[in-house]
A protein has these predicted regions:
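Accessory nucleic-acid engagement/destabilization modules that flank
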Residues: 1-179
């Protein structure tokens, strides 16, 4: 996948490469939806007269991530990266108080079809192994950040600050690579 290879090539930190590969491989999984495929065929057939855009193609990747990895900080980070690759989302709706995950879980995205098509293309074992490697790297980074914050006490930022910087870097590389 071009997005994956480009993102890995511009990554300045080798310990992020597995996380980058996981986010890139899953960010457009929703394009396997029947509705998305039909929309793309209409664009080819009708050109400028076709309906363009507006079809959710990021929810499936984030939802799959959370299903396979469970609810934890890693799955929260990676699903938010995937959900946000075309613009940041509020994590809590001010309208109804629902979390981003609850909102995304309510979306009708042909999830089971997308999941079966993805596993048919890549293999379920490959996806699970990819996520396991990314989780190992996340855990290693998190331990390093915790140690750094503990060793340096005040004045150098909190764990949330440093993990937020990793998030920003990961999101930037995904966005820069997805063109």
């Amino acid at each position: 996948d071009n997005t994956t290879e480009f993102a890995k090539s511009i990554c300045p930190l080798s310990n992020l490469k597995n996380i980058i590969e996981a986010e890139c491989e899953l960010h457009d999984v929703g394009k396997l939806r029947e509705k998305f495929q039909t929309d793309m065929l209409d664009v080819l057939r009708l050109g400028d007269d076709a309906h363009k855009g507006g079809i959710d193609h990021s929810t499936a990747g984030g939802r799959l991530m959370r299903e396979l990895m469970g609810e934890n900080e890693f799955s929260d980070l990676l699903s938010l990266l995937i959900y946000s690759h075309h613009g940041l989302n509020d994590c809590i709706s001010l309208d109804n108080g629902k979390t981003l995950n609850e909102i995304r879980d309510d979306n009708d995205i042909e999830y089971e079809l997308v999941k079966s098509r993805l596993f048919e293309l890549y293999g379920e074992d490959y996806i699970k192994e990819l996520l396991a490697k990314a989780k190992e790297d996340f855990d290693r980074i998190d331990m390093q950040v915790k140690k750094y914050v503990k060793d340096h006490k005040k004045g150098y930022g909190s764990r949330y600050f440093f993990m937020g910087m990793y998030f920003r870097l990961l999101l930037s590389m995904l966005i820069d690579s997805d063109w």
